[in-house]
Regions:
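Extracytoplasmic thiol/disulfide redox context detector
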Residues: 2-94, 209-217
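Extracytoplasmic/secreted envelope proteins and their assembly/folding machinery
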Residues: 69-73, 99-103, 116, 133, ...
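Structural microenvironment flanking redox-active thiols in thiol-disulfide oxidoreductases
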Residues: 78-141
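Short, flexible segments with low predicted structural confidence
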Residues: 34, 44, 77, 112, ...
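Conserved strand-to-helix beginnings and helix N-cap segments that scaffold or border functional pockets
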Residues: 66-69, 96-100, 194-197
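C-terminal cap of thioredoxin/glutaredoxin-like
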Residues: 142-217
């Protein structure tokens, strides 16, 4: 059974914190290169057309990624306009493979939107070892996923290809830690650089605007 008892409390706390933070807040200055973000040189290609591409590199086992997720979900729900979000499981080490395979298998079987947050919550809050394949398979089968279809997809060449692509992207985008966010193939920032998860999404908004201005030149 999915344990979601913390979800509403987490989201409510995030919304209240964001609302409180907005009272009396001063307009932030321009993002500072090499302090708030780094610039990829050359810029990496994007496939988002007229939209600004935002890529989140994450790891389900990362507590800061877990903390970020409700804020990121709220940011995605509210805008900004003309932005597309892409999630990529970072693969800095082979120990992260199982969680990346879980992400891509849930995506391939059509259950990612429903189970993305519960993976985080059940792992971090409930201590369910979802990075272990046997535990993972039992968990998904108890949460409405066909067990045999999941296992077949999990071990398929298609998922292995996605892992290889994610590993290449982690290296190509010079990802040093998670969560990291890449804006329009040009700017890379992180919760560490921003000073926190709430500050990270505020910084992303500013970098999206910077990317939009650079596109207009």
């Amino acid at each position: 059974m999915i344990v979601l008892r913390k979800t509403l409390a987490v989201l409510a706390a995030v919304f209240l914190a964001l609302a409180a933070a907005g009272v009396g807040a001063q307009a932030p200055g321009l993002p500072q290169l090499n302090r708030d973000y780094v610039r990829l040189d050359p810029p990496r290609p994007v496939a988002s057309g007229d939209r600004i591409e935002v890529i989140e590199f994450f790891y389900y086992g990362c507590p800061v990624c877990y903390e970020l997720e409700p804020t990121l979900a709220r940011w995605l729900f509210n805008g900004p306009a003309s932005v597309t979000l892409r999630r990529v499981p970072a693969l800095a080490t082979d120990n992260w493979d199982n969680f990346a395979k879980l992400f891509y298998t849930l995506e391939a079987t059509g259950h990612l939107a429903r189970l993305h947050w519960p993976v985080y919550d059940n792992f971090h809050f409930d201590g369910i070892k979802l990075n272990e394949e046997a535990v993972m398979v039992n968990w998904v089968s108890h949460n409405g996923v066909d067990k045999e279809k999941f296992i077949s997809a999990y071990h398929s060449p298609e998922i292995q290809a996605k892992l290889a692509a994610a590993r290449d992207m982690t290296r190509n985008y010079e990802i040093k830690g998670v969560p990291s966010i890449v804006i329009d193939g040009k700017f890379v920032t992180s919760a560490r650089m921003a000073g926190g998860t709430r500050e990270l999404m505020q910084l992303v908004d500013r970098l999206v605007e910077l990317a939009r201005k650079e596109r207009a030149k």
